[in-house]
Amino acid sequence: MAPLRPIFTLALLLWVVLADQESCKDRCTEGFNANRKCQCDELCSYYQSCCADYAAECKPQVTRGDVFTMPEDEYGPYDYIEQTKDNASVHAQPESPTVGQEPTLSPDLQTEGGAEPTHEVPLEPEMETLRPEGEDLQAGTTELGTSASPAEEELCSGKPFDAFTDLKNGSLFAFRGQYCYELDETAVRPGYPKLIQDVWGIEGPIDAAFTRINCQGKTYLFKGSQYWRFEDGILDPDYPRNISEGFSGIPDNVDAAFALPAHSYSGRERVYFFKGDKYWEYQFQQQPSQEECEGSSLSAVFEHFAMLHRDSWEDIFKLLFWGRPSGGARQPQFISRDWHGVPGKVDAAMAGRIYISGLTPSPSAKKQKSRRRSRKRYRSRYGRGRSQNSRRLSRSISRLWFSSEEVSLGPYNYEDYETSWLKPATSEPIQSVYFFSGDKYYRVNLRTQRVDTVNPPYPRSIAQYWLGCPAPGGQ
């Protein structure tokens, strides 16, 4: 019997190891659980925290409702009447934020919780209640009681913009002079422009803005030698701060900025700053953990990016969102050398949504009643309470996520479309970057760093494609 002893011992050790490993069995809908050694929630692929049997037990899939198939400024066939009936203006609702520790910019800049009360800014996109599109405010009025007269700020004037940025709830904001605009899928939302002072608590104009693409989704505004940081519309304690302290190596009075996500939780987020004919690349030291973000609403922009990690695009994400071993700022480079086709000086910049190329559906026999821009905004599937019990989108919510060319496909079961339709061999994620200069803008493919070749060509009119103004010579 002696020879059996080693076999028995080995079997016992194997049992101990297997017992120590947690499983996703019956856990696929429980969400993030800080008390577990491994996770089974929908974001575990990004955080590299999934249990070993996550794929087998939970069968993670990228569905049609998780992706865009067109960039923001393109057009597609669209049944306007049906969309208007089903559509609603959905904005993420804020919770009382519990601010997690911000990624380290430098050792002496840690935010001390409770050091001083936060300055509440009535950031309208985070604070508004749900209402159908047809029930928007009357044009020229605002929820804050401030109305900008056309003499003060003419929407279609062609004046250059100072900044564009997506907020964590997917709302798109544009800044020009003393005013800011919130943009919907085709134009400016009713009630805008509003004074930057009334919405953000900062006197305009500002120089640049960006929103980090991580679970916290904090927004940064830059003006002169200082910057402000907001979470859920509330100014973080001890702000504003000097750019030289928080972003060492980045100059004051920047012209533009945009942020990119890390390729995964082990990677680093990047921000590009532009001033004059040069640009700087800055890399954050670290990003917040999933546990640190549990007390606040999840960034819808980050959620959309993290969902794409379910599929086989790891190598592409590493190529697009690579990171250097060390953080901080790199030496400045010339814009004209690295961003081909972009003017030598830009006024504003913004990272576009990630869309999947090669997924254009077959035309429907259904009559196409209209063509409309496809600037669908991000929609959080978790909603206000971040409930993860429902793993699939309803038909109505799925419609809000689809690009405009998908909405006219006719009747089908929206919940039956899984990864069989999405083949990485024939499609891949595309990250666009928008550069705004004067009254025109350019769309650049991040991977090639070249202006896209499309028809109509770039540069295109900001007023026409982003503000809903008539085309030059139009009515």
Curated annotation (Swiss-Prot):
Which keywords annotate this record?
Cell adhesion, Disulfide bond, Glycoprotein, Heparin-binding, Phosphoprotein, Repeat, Secreted, Signal, Sulfation
Positions carrying Phosphoserine: 312, 394
Which residue ranges does the record annotate as region Glycosaminoglycan binding region?
Answer: 366-392
Location relative to the cell: Secreted, Extracellular space
Kindly list the positions at which Sulfotyrosine occurs in this protein.
75, 78, 80, 279, 282
Instruction: Describe the function of this protein.
Output: Vitronectin is a cell adhesion and spreading factor found in serum and tissues. Vitronectin interact with glycosaminoglycans and proteoglycans. Is recognized by certain members of the integrin family and serves as a cell-to-substrate adhesion molecule. Inhibitor of the membrane-damaging effect of the terminal cytolytic complement pathway.
Q: What is this protein called?
A: Vitronectin
Q: Which organism is it from?
A: Oryctolagus cuniculus
